[in-house]
Amino acid sequence: LGVSLPGLTQWEKLRMSYVKPDQLIDAIVHSGVDKSNLTVPQMVARGTLAGAILGAATTVALTAAEQTGLPIVGAVLFPVGFVMIILLGLELVTGSFALIPLAVMEGRTNVAKCVTNFSVVIASHIVGAALYGALYVTAITYAGTETSDPMVQAIVHLAEHKVLPYEAVGLGGIVAVVIKAMLCNWMVAIGTIISYSSSSTAGKILAMWLPVTTFFSLGLEHAVVNMFVIPAGMMLGADISFGQWWGWNQAPVLVGNLLGALLFTALPLYFSHRTRINRAVDVPPSVVRREPALLDF
């Protein structure tokens, strides 16, 4: 660590930044412990900023899709927000859904701290996303005096699409939204965990980009994205009430995101790579050993 290797090419350096899966588990468990031990003010600050950043990334994606007529362009651009959140060390509850429970499983934190983190960060996301939404709505409507911007109707349509079709079919709608949320956070949790698979910034960015682009391109349900889209749509006149928002989208999406992170990502990876021998010790991710020749390029 810290040794200069001037003779290596950039490709060789990228190979050396790869972290083995068993060491990856050490890193994410340690991260889960760190997240559970944050103070409430830290959680509030990090969660609020993350909510606002993800709202901004969503508007970038919607703007790109609107301008090009190609939703896939928006999906490719959306991960900029996720990358900023991870690299800045902020709190994104959909990622924490995969990390903190593993720390609880290993007895390195407790359920009370886990629930506190989830609750405080979710509330902070709502504040950050809604604040950004209010500022963005004010900007594109010229303080409520103009509604000709194409983004107005794009956001209203998306907000209504995230609530009304589920409500229209009743119980089947709840099942559908939970499944969409589970599939979404399968990818988001992979994005969170895979960011620990490289010790280089470039490697982290590339690794995160792939699964996050996948979820957004499929039109799945992400709780924090919806904390921006639906309130912003309501501010712009979407035919949605607070009860409809929470009953037919936000609450079931949070449940689905938690289940997806745990059942589809965290637990399968944990039980695939964790053994008694490599069970986590209190080693921070920054000192996880690197292996130079682990990939066949």
Residue ranges and their predicted role:
Residues 1-15:
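Short, Lys/Arg-enriched N-terminal segments with co-localized hydrophobic residues
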Residues 14-297:
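Alpha-helical transmembrane segments and their helix-helix packing motifs
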